[in-house]
Curated annotation (Swiss-Prot):
It is found in: Cell inner membrane. This is Rhomboid protease GlpG. One of its GO terms (molecular function) is serine-type endopeptidase activity. One of its GO terms (cellular component) is plasma membrane. It comes from Shigella flexneri serotype 5b (strain 8401). It is a multi-pass membrane protein. It holds the Pfam family Rhomboid_N. The chain crosses the membrane at residues 94-114, 142-162, 169-189, 192-212, 229-249, 250-270.
Amino acid sequence: MLMITSFANPRVAQAFVDYMATQGVILTIQQHNQSDVWLADESQAERVRAELARFLENPADPRYLAASWLAGHTGSGLHYRRYPFFAALRERAGPVTWVMMIACVVVFIAMQILGDQEVMLWLAWPFDPTLKFEFWRYFTHALMHFSLMHILFNLLWWWYLGGAVEKRLGSGKLIVITLISALLSGYVQQKFSGPWFGGLSGVVYALMGYVWLRGERDPQSGIYLQRGLIIFALIWIVAGWFDLFGMSMANGAHIAGLAVGLAMAFVDSLNARKRK
């Protein structure tokens, strides 16, 4: 899907969506801080942008109001669609995003039933030389979470960032970022604290770094992260490093993950520029 534009007024957004529907182009609206207009069929992007330019010149043109009536939006003439919570979740997340979320939830439930130690014996970073060829361990540490707040925080960010990467750049790109960041952030963290750690935060920080820098250097990629959020991520790293909140944080994984994401975004945006 491709985001075409955002409107501060949801009624204006609906007017444009209704008009394009009469032209045979289906757009959808997602409500965030503004009304974001999305196009599923990206092959029609140029046509939609041309119509948008005409619409913005005179959104009060009678043909747009007429389109709303044709689309069945009478009453005040316009209204914006409301999407149920789960529909919004489904629309943003691709299959890889969902598989990871489900896997983390299943592992979390197992940890509540069997105990943390029992699950860690199977999924933790290799804690004995005899386990170094159990290759899944270099990645499955990311599935383990030790509190409800821990898993909710990580999965919210994973859904928001991983879903955006998968929708815009494909499942393959999300898989590559996830595997590389899980491996390298885990390696660094075990150097800091030993093998007994877990959580998706190393991958989440990689996605933060990737989405932010890729959006800055390659806006046409369609992904972005507000600068305020990347500043928040850096503040959180500093807070964890100096133990300002008295919480046990995987500081090594956070720093390594962020570095991995930034490096991958730099390389990918460089390659994108070369292709132009």
